[in-house]
């Protein structure tokens, strides 16, 4: 019925339970009553307080389910929606006079009211509490900083006999310190003061206009237009490098940083564009290929490959010998050693994400990555630093996948089929009807299935070894692992062994193992 009528479960429940509002439905009322208990007030007595009670009741339900689904507070996408809901709930808690951490107490009520229908809430209770409490603590710190500044402003106003806080100060509190304007307004009202609303609106409009003009100026100076826009928009480069590292193609265009040219001689730094290439262009965190381009009259060293406009691949190159020209046939050769080193790190990044999700939980999602020939850097959603034990477990699991010599399969398929297989997609990424899926392992031994357009090895055993070199914070709710594979692990071990040996010699110890005694 609720689906056909579009009335929603809560509205249907309010009819069945013969109550006036969804906030009087049994499961919602229990949360509302808990909010009132924490705030020390009664619902239905004061309009402004009732609004705050309803906001907290609604938002704590939403963010509890969002956290259960693996979403973390952030500054973009769903994470941003979650952050705004969380902070709005905390802010209304302040308006009700709640000063300490209180969201974690309400989570218990939300879970108790919904665990029969959604048993994953109870399973993830501790995790949900950690996520919400961390964000609440961070926002409280923001509020505390803003309160100190606002208290100083109020004291100065009282000293000067003023009753209105100027719009510029209100805007600075909001824009620079993240202190909500409605909380500023509420605190001023308690002191018998007001906020210069018109002045605040003017500052806000001025900032928007400044940002708009800055963008327009940037566009006017040509930063949004490059030499590559001068090339026919229908021209594109076909990538043939998934299964080959060499290929022949015609040089279609040669450019400098700012103009199209017909030829280039030894010593020139140029961009070479062709209709086909085995060179992978930087994308998805995987760096562009390097190598050589050779014609009958010249040789170029490719130092980078980038996707430019409308599907065109630009080979950044230095002409080392002779001369090259538009229209010449050329032989393109990717540097094999570098490509395979990059593929080791990229394939291992997939195994790393799979291991992180097993050790830390399914809330872990890729938030960014960089894979080059020397290392892999993987950013992921997680709310606090990994323990030493967790890092060891992740390392052990990744190396287990490597030693199991799992086959790596790459295939294109309809997106619906990929989703049925449970392939991991990058949050916020837009995909077409057909996607490329990378699968590591088979059947019960499948370690990873991900959407990915990058290049990979054919078997996990070719990664060799995996070792985490560091784990750190990038932003609130985002952690970063830097790691090495293959020969990089040996180099890291040798470097650390040398450091330990030096420490032992400094302490005049014959055996480095005696350092820990």
Q: What do the predicted segments below correspond to?
A:
Residues 3-517:
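A glycine- and charged-residue-rich anion-binding loop/surface
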């Amino acid at each position: 019925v609720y689906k056909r009528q579009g009335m929603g479960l809560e509205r249907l429940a309010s009819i069945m339970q013969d109550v006036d509002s969804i906030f009087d439905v049994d499961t919602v009322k229990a949360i509302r009553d808990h909010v009132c208990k924490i705030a020390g007030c009664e619902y239905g007595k004061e309009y402004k307080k009732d609004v705050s009670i309803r906001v907290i009741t609604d938002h704590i339900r939403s963010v509890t389910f969002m956290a259960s689904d693996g979403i973390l507070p952030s500054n973009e996408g769903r994470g941003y929606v979650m952050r705004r809901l969380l902070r709005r709930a905390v802010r209304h808690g302040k308006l009700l006079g709640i000063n300490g951490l209180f969201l974690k107490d309400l989570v218990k009520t939300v879970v108790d009211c919904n665990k029969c229908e959604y048993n994953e809430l109870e399973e993830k209770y501790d995790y949900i509490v950690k996520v919400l409490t961390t964000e609440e603590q961070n926002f409280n710190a923001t509020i505390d900083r803003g309160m100190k500044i606002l208290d100083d402003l109020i004291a100065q106003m009282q000293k000067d006999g003023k009753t209105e806080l100027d719009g510029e100060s209100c805007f600075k509190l909001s824009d620079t310190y993240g202190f909500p304007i409605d909380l500023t307004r509420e605190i001023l009202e308690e002191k018998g003061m007001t906020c210069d609303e018109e002045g605040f609106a003017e500052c806000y409009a001025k900032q928007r206009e400044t940002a708009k003009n800055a963008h327009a100026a940037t566009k006017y100076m040509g930063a949004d237009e490059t030499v590559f826009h001068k090339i026919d928009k229908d021209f594109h480069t076909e990538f043939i490098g998934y299964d080959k590292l060499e290929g022949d193609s015609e040089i279609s265009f040669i450019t400098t940083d700012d103009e199209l040219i017909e030829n280039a001689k030894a010593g020139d730094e140029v961009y070479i564009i062709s209709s086909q290439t085995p060179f992978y262009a930087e994308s998805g965190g995987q760096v562009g290929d390097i190598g050589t381009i050779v014609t009958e009259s010249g040789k170029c060293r490719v130092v980078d490959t980038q996707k430019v406009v409308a599907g065109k691949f630009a080979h950044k190159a230095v002409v080392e010998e002779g001369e090259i020209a538009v229209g010449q046939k050329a032989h393109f050769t990717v540097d094999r050693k570098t490509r395979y080193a990059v593929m080791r790190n990229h394939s291992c990044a997939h195994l790393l994400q799979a291991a992180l999700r097993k050790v830390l939980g399914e809330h872990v999602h890729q938030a960014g990555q960089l894979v080059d020939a020397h290392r892999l850097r993987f950013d992921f959603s997680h709310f606090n630093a990994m323990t030493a034990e967790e890092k060891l477990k992740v390392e052990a699991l990744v190396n287990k996948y490597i030693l199991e010599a799992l086959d790596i399969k790459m295939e294109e398929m309809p997106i619906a089929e990929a989703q049925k297989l449970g392939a991991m997609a990058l949050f916020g990424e837009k995909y077409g009807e057909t996607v490329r899926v990378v699968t590591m392992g088979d059947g019960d031994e499948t370690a990873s299935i991900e959407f990915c357009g990058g290049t990979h090895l054919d078997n996990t055993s070719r990664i060799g070894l995996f070792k985490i070199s560091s784990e750190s914070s990038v932003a609130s709710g985002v952690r970063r692992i830097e790691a090495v594979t293959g020969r990089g692990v040996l180099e890291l071990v040798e470097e650390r062994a040398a450091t330990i040996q030096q420490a032992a010699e400094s302490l005049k110890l014959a055996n480095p193992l005696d350092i820990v005694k």
